[in-house]
Structures are given as C-alpha cells and as structure tokens.
Amino acid sequence: MARKAPDQDAGEALRRFKSDLKAGTLGNFYIISGEEAFLRSHYVDLITKKIADGPAGEFNCHRFSADDCTPQALADAIDAMPMMAERTLVRVDDVDLFKQPEGAREQYAAIFSDLPDYCCVLFVYDTVEFKINGTMKKLAAAIREHAQILTFGKQSERDLCAWITRHFRAHDKMVTDELCQYLIFRTDGLMTTLAGEIDKIAAYQQGPAITRGAIDAVVIPALSA
C-alpha cells in the first residue's frame, strides 16, 4: 500500500478532530500548530469550552508554559481528578519537547504513553515551531502513536473567499468573489489580519455592497502585496 502524503494525513486528522468535537468524543492528546493563529485560537477555545466549561471549569483546567512546565508538574496535573465534570484539560503552550534534557524527554514519553481517559492534554504552538525529531526515538514514537497532530496552515483562496463573504454578511454587507480575492491580495492572507480588516471595511462602507474604494481607503497593504 502506498504511503499517504503528509498533507493527506493532516487532512484526515482535521476531519477526525472536527467530527469528534461535534460528537463530544474528543481524544486525550492533541498537538495544535500552524501559522493560521485565528484557527488555532478558535479550536483551542472550542476544546476548552467542550471539556472545562462547567461550574468547576477553572479547577478542571490546568495551564503551563515553558517557564513552569516540567514532567512532574505535567504528571501531577494529569493525575488530578475532575471535579463536578467528566474530564479535565491540561494545556501546555510553546514547550519544545525535543529540546528538553534526555531524562525529561523519557519522562514525557512515558507520560504520553499512559494518559487517562478523563484527561485531555493539549500542546499549543504559537511562537515555537512544532516539529518531530525522529532521532529522539522514544519521544517521537510516543507522540506519533498517541497524539493527534493538528496543523492549521494558511487557507486556500477558495476557502478564504467563502469565509470573508460570511463575515461581511454578519455585518449586513455583500461582497463579490473578485473583491474577496483583492482583499486577500492586499493583506497577508491570514484570517487574523482579515478579520480586523473586514470589521474596518464594514464600518467604513456606506450602503450594503462592499466596494474596492472602501478596501483601498482603510486597508494598509501588506509588504508582499
């Protein structure tokens, strides 16, 4: 059987994740990365609300950064039983697992290989790039076997046009596909940037139809535009 390309695997991982999120059957280990910060933030928020949004939400949600995350601290948080809820959430931001000392890497590998069903561990990467280092075999194997890796990259022009149209519609504005493409060209094409520009354009534009003049008036062109 031919081996699947990385983008196929990534697409399948995202489809599975979205299906599990909708069904309320989230797994217990996710790694979220990619340059599209808007989507990263969106889905991290949805996971958090799904798992730790009850009356004891703060108690059931544990968060670490590179400054305070250690194997022992992570293990203690994972071992903490949920209060007035079915599950707990442990979020770790921007910790490069493969740059940890060998002893810590082995401890992390052991932790990831024995996660309880009541806990969802979420590693989120924003300022640090996530990349598996295959030379560190134990940790790499544990992540590949147990983690669902979700990469939110730059969206296609087609998907962005549909998304831009929906967001203008929320402002009671109409926009053509041609102007959606122009707005993408004028910006860096990232949804975080586009969301802010859409709000500005909608506030500036008089009448229901977005015009090129309104885009030119308020959008500061990206250096690459």
Language-model-detected regions and their locations in the chain:
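Conserved beta/loop motifs at nucleotide-recognition and modification sites
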Residues: M1-A225
